[in-house]
Amino acid sequence: MVLIKVLANHLILQLSYAQKSSELVIGGDECNINEHRFLVALYHSRSRTFLCGGTLINQEWVLTAAHCDRFLMYIRLGMHNKNVKFDDEQRRFPKEKYFFACSNNFTKWDKDIMLIRLNRPVNNSEHIAPLSLPSNPPSVGSVCRVMGWGTITSPNETLPDVPHCANINLLHYSVCQAAYPKLPVTRRLLCAGILEGGIDSCHRDSGGPLICNGQFQGIVSWGRYPCAQPRVPGIYIKVFDYTDWIQSIIAGNTAVNCPP
């Protein structure tokens, strides 16, 4: 099973829910080797520990969750099996990191987003290609694809060597409001999962993409642990609501304000 719930291993929330770290997919299967050319893996530079997923959005920029940030980190692109390196796999380091100028932290969970500029651009190859930002907002009821190297079992964790993928449904925001009483009223979050449970993002899926109808619509952010509980969907950052900010940063306007 694909567990992609995000448990930030450096945070302990004093809330009724736990944040999913950058982690895995429960209830899924190994991803097709050709379906995740945009999926990247974030590692801690000193310990070489896998931290989170991320998404390559052009040759020089990666989008991930803010809670995945570490002072020293590197990024693997074109990776499938953690222990087997493709000829075209690339490694890059963050040159610049961008968060919202109006927020010094990401305790407001709808702002759990980080834009990373790579120290050198990457070229498209057999296992590397960017995923475009969404042109339209997602629709409730859409079938979405979630993926990552997060744990595939919960609460006892099993971290796989290969990414797992699973299909989940984009649910009405009220479903997550019922599951998480302290959830912000904001609509810049997406609610996605399977009401019956059994399929979910989980620990160390954080930062990875949620793809709905072929468009990059969400970033794995947080959820309840153990993962994949009935009527407790996962929370994802709504990428569409941040496209103007992302495009402004990429264009060089680093003083741009975040959305209200």
Curated annotation (Swiss-Prot):
InterPro entries named among the record's database cross-references: Peptidase_S1_PA, Peptidase_S1_PA_chymotrypsin, Peptidase_S1A, Trypsin_dom, TRYPSIN_HIS
> What is the first-listed, main subcellular location in coarse terms?
secreted
Annotated ranges, domain Peptidase S1:
25-251
Q: Which GO terms describe its cellular component?
A: extracellular region; secretory granule
MF terms in GO? serine-type endopeptidase activity; toxin activity
Which residues does UniProt mark as catalytic? H67, D112, S206
The glycosylation sites annotated in the UniProt record are: N105, N123, N156
Q: List the disulfide bonds.
A: C31-C165, C52-C68, C102-C258, C144-C212, C176-C191, C202-C227
User: By its UniProt entry, which SMART domains does this protein fall under?
Assistant: Tryp_SPc
Q: What CDD domains is this protein classified in?
A: Tryp_SPc (cd00190)
Per the UniProt entry, what are the Gene Ontology biological process annotations, in alphabetical order? proteolysis
The keyword Nucleotide-binding appears for this protein: no
Q: Where in the cell is it found?
A: Secreted
- EC number, UniProt record: 3.4.21.-
Provide the leader sequence positions. Answer: 1-18
Which residues get removed as pro-piece? 19-24
Asked whether the UniProt record includes Iron among its keywords, one would answer: no
Which keywords does this Swiss-Prot/TrEMBL entry list? Disulfide bond, Glycoprotein, Hemostasis impairing toxin, Hydrolase, Protease, Secreted, Serine protease, Signal, Toxin, Zymogen
Q: What tissues express this gene product?
A: Expressed by the venom gland.
Q: What does this protein do?
A: Snake venom serine protease that may act in the hemostasis system of the prey.
Subunit organization: Monomer.
Question: What does the sequence similarity comment in the record state about its family?
Answer: Belongs to the peptidase S1 family. Snake venom subfamily.
Quote the protein name from its UniProt record: Snake venom serine protease salmobin
Organism name: Gloydius halys (Chinese water mocassin)
Organism ancestry: Eukaryota, Metazoa, Chordata, Craniata, Vertebrata
